[in-house]
Structure formats: structure tokens, C-alpha cells
Amino acid sequence: MQTIAEILSKELNETLPHVQNVIELLDGGNTVPFIARYRKEMHGSMDDQQIRKLADRLTYLRNLDARRSEIKQSIASQEKLTGELSAKLDGAATLAELEDLYRPYKPKRTTRASIAKEKGLMPLAAKLLLQEPAADPVKLAEKYVNPGKGVNTPDEALSGARDIIAERLSDSADIRRYIKELAHRSGAITASRAADAPEDNGVYDMYFDFSEGLSTIPGYRVLAINRGEKEGFLKVSVNIPEEGAERIVALSVVRGSCPCSKQVEAAAKDAWSRLIYPSVTRELRSMLTDEACEQAIATFAVNLKPLLMQPPVKGMVTMGLDPGYRTGCKVAVVDETGKVLDTAVIYPAPPHNKIAEAERIVTGLIKKHNVKVISIGNGTAGRETEKFAADTVKGTDVKYVIVSEAGASVYSASKLGAEEFPDYDVSLRSAVSIARRLQDPLAELVKIDPKSIGVGQYQHDMPQKRLDETLEGVVEDCVNSVGVDLNTASVSLLSHVSGINSTVAKNIVAYREAEGAFRSRKELLKVPKLGAKAYEQCAGFLRVPESAEMLDNTAVHPESYRAAKSLLLLCGSDISKLPDELKRIGMDKAAEECGIGVPTLKDIIRELQKPGRDPRDELPKPLLRSDVMEMSDLVPGMELTGTVRNIVDFGAFVDIGVHQDGLVHISRICDKFIRHPSEVLKPGDIVTVWVLEVDQKKKRISLTMKKER
């Protein structure tokens, strides 16, 4: 039997020592960002996503082993654990396979078969299974008639014996495996309109007469069908070829055509229709749902990461507009660091239409604070607010950007929002958040539950614990990839740093408020509850620009300061000479002299050449706009530049500046075949698109990224 490390090595195509090292590091309480960044020599430079995948599979395989042990103990206690069965259990690669093998030995609630066994009909079932040509089933059954046990006639005895045979067939791991293989090859999931379905608004139209193969149906359709069934619109079933399934069951047990064989054949048909079909279809649907959820969670993660990693718009005084109709549009002006300078409420949209007054207020704030860019939320009244802003800044150098306001209202009404802005109305907090989202998306978005950011499909239908764990991993990876300024970071941002929990994050901020700015990374050890292990995990991801130690403002870990200083000595503290010096002595020799591995050496060189490097600066900046377009302005063939807002399994939604995102179907993203849009696109990408079709009535815009030739 393979060890877990050997299984993972084969699955992930990583060397066994590297896998063993990662397992040891994880078991030692090291975080994924720390392992990925500062232990590269131990795992061959696996990235954070690869390590998380390994950690996920490690948990699954350990749970599998634990369940295997439980099952073996249970069967052994029944004195039924044979060498052959033990080997089969050892060979089971999934929990489903394990449970199928355990079915015959699993304690059951009362069933028709268990009642028949209590009536003493097991020997009759065994005799029927012998299928002796000369045997008469009725005469065999007469011996088991016992009114005292509730067996009044030979027919009742035969019925009970068939129930025992049917359950035995239903519990066969081999039969269940063959049926599932048949279902995967030839089965389909079907949906139709439920008899008592409520009035439909068109959402489930395509599923009222629907059938698709189990092996080909995409995950998003599985989740849509599940939701339609849950809401009472759809009746859903799994179709498995009945003739083929019955043949599989019968061939496993029926021999010949004697009278006893007819009884066994009847039991086989009953096993299929009454026991195997309902059970297997439940399993198949559960499996489809699990796979669909994993795919949807992965898509959510793919969308979330680039949203968090959007390049900040630095060094600009920013105005945030939170649009609204009746309650007005909330305005907040923040300086280059995100500090609130001014707030106001304007009413440019219906029913008030106080456009002139709103223009006067906004123009005054722009001049007073030298506002350079306006950040506009894309929610209710966003269209009218965008037009108002475009008209107001026309002829000036002020630009505007539409930002997603998803989650802003959640933050503004949260305990965190109240603590940060106790004197501001909830709606004004939203305007501040919208302004800050443009200045530093990561620092602002970490204050919000990732599920509220609005980039997932069917997120409420997914296992919430699994979704939370995955999204938290994405947030953690992003925060640690960028690094955090120890003297300006909020509790929310600090709590996502490797090795720091919310309690320690609060203690860091409390220490900062009491003692003033941190003057070095080493000072972190004075923070209550931040011990040596936490310091090891977090220090490299925290920056202290004010420190006398230059390396404290880089991603170089304190454990590598001596190596970094040895490197500086090599080039006489002139970083520009370092490449020539390294070429002269060689990377391997330099690493050896510094007492580190080559991967760590390369990371240190990168940091010394660009101290304070922000990986977000290398990504495309948000599109700044100065005018507005209407949907009616669009015509087929028109070329536009847009921003990818969201990735879904069937395509990508692109903001082209008309307040209604257009859809680029997966087939129109590129010329080569792709399985998923995320292979070539991510949220935040700036793309060139062409208009294919505009449906004003349904508010739908179809786009293509493939220029028509």
C-alpha cells in the first residue's frame, strides 16, 4: 500500500522528498505563504496554489485513511474481515469506494431483508441462489412456513427470500461500480417543468424540456438545475439505461433458466428498481453537485484574486460617489493616503433632479481639494450618476472610473465600518469605501467578507465552510504577495498576514497607538501574544519604511539578512554591479558563500534591485474615462476597449462603458480551443472587443474578442 506522500508525489508530479518536506512544514505549523516564499529549497519552488492543492489532498487522504481504519475495526468486530476484503479496502482511492465496500457490513435500520432474516428465511435464500435445476422453489419454501414468525404461505417465504437476495445484490460493490460506469457512459440528467411549478420569469425556460449526458453536463448547469428543483420549478431525474442496468445485476447472479433461477431473476429486477437505482442516482447527483461546487469555488477564487490584486491608483486625491435615487448620491473626498477630507450628499438623479446644485457642490469640492479622479459605484442610479459626473468634469483633466460597489453596503453597516467611522452615516461610509477601492483595492476589500464582493456563481448553494476556506486562502496569498506596511495597515489587513490572527492584529495596532510607529521588524517581538513562531511566519511580509535597517522595507526575511549583506559586500554596496559580479563567480558559488540556496538568492537579488516592489504595479491599470456612452450608441462591428469584470464557466463579462456589461461567450474569446475562460482571461484585464449583437429589450450585449475577417 502506497504512503500518502507517495500518492501525492504521483498525483502532483512532484518529487517525493519535496512532498515529504511540505507535509513536514505544514505539520510544523507553518503557513502556506511562508512555505511558498521562504522555504523554496525544501520544495523545489512550488507556488502557493500548488502547496494549497497539496494541503487539500493531504487532508482528504488522511480522512480517507482514518475512515478506512474505522471500517476495518467495525468489520473485524463482526469477525468478517478477510485478507481479500482488507486488500480491497486498502486499494480504495475514494471515500465513495470505501463506503461501497462497507455496505454489506454496515449496521442497517430495519429493512425488508432484515425482517426476512428475523423470520428465518436466510437458508431459503441460500438454496434459491444455488439454482439447482431439479429444485422446486415452492416445495423448498414450504419448509419455512411458520405462522408464529409471520410466514403464512410458501409465497410469503419466497418473497422474503427474494428480499434477502435483492439486498445482497444492492450491497455488492462490484455491481454498484458497473452500474456507475454505465451511467457515466450512457446516463443523462433530465429536467422538466414541475406539475405545480410557480409562474416562471424565464430563468428556467431552457430546463423545461432538458436532457444532457452525465459525463458532459457543465457544472453551472448542474447548479442551475439544483436551484430550479429546490425552488419548485423543475422535476429532475437521472436516466440510466434500464435494460443494460438490469442485465448487469442479473448476470452477476442468475445462472440458467430453472424455476429457482426465475426467483433469483425476479430478485435481481427488484434489487435494481427498488434499491440500486434510487441509491445510485442519489450518489450520482451528489457527485455531480460536489464536482460542480468545486468548479464554482475554483471559478470564484479565479475571479477574486485579480480583483484583490488590481493596481492601486496612487498619489491622487479621490472623490467617491455612492449613487442613489430617493436618498441621494453620497460624496466623499479622500486624500492620497485615504484620509477623509470632506463629505456631502447631492441629488442629481430622479425624483429630485437637482443637477445644477449637485454640479456646484461637486465642482466646489474638486477645486477645494484638487481632486484628480472620481470613483463611481456601479449600483442603483449608477448610470445617471455616471452621466452627471461625465458632464460635470467635461473640459477638465479630472477622469472617472466605474468600480464595483459589491459589499460596500455590507462593510458600511458592519461593526468594523462603525468602528472606523463612528461619526459618519452608513451611506457616507460606503462613499469612502468606494473612493478607497480605487486607491488601494486590496486594503479596502479585505474589510469585506469575500462572498459579498460579487464575483461568484451560485455561492449560496455551495458548502460554506469549503468556500470560506478557499476564499480566505486567496485573500491570504494576495495580502502576503503584496506585503503590508506595519505602520499604516488596518486590523483587517494585518489579520490576513501569515502567522497573525485577529487578536494579534489588534495587539499590533494597540501597540502602535500606544508606543508610536514601529522602528524595526524586531520590535514586533514586544507585541503581546506575538511569539518567536509568529514572528518567523509574519516578519518577511511586513514592511517598516521608517526603519534604519533598509532590509526591513523589503521582502527579505530577517533570517536572510546576513546573506543579503554578504551579497552587498560582493558588489561593494553598488547594486548595479551585482549582475556582473554574479556572472563572474556564478550563482551556485554566490549562494554557497552566502549560506543560502539559489532560489532564496534570486529572491534577495530581486528585492535589493527593487526594494519596496509592489507586484500589482506590473498589472494593467484601470481604464480612466471622461465621457459616457449609451446602449443605443452600440452597433454591430463597433470596436471598443473594455475591462473584464467577471469570469464564468461559459464566458466573460466585459465593462465597455455603457453600464451594462457585455458577454463574450467562451467560443468567441480566442481562436484556439480552451476549456475555461480563465485560461486566457482574468478580471481586471483590459481587452479589445467587437459588438456582435445588442438586445435593448433584454438588456443584453453580445461581444467577441475575435475580429471578423
Where are the model-predicted features located?
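Structured, non-catalytic alpha/beta "coupling" segments that mediate domain-domain communication
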Residues: S74, E99-Y102, G228-P241, L251-I276, ...
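A glycine-rich phosphate-binding loop feature that marks nucleotide/adenosyl-phosphate handling sites
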Residues: E181-A188, L321-Y325, G379-E384, V403-V410, ...
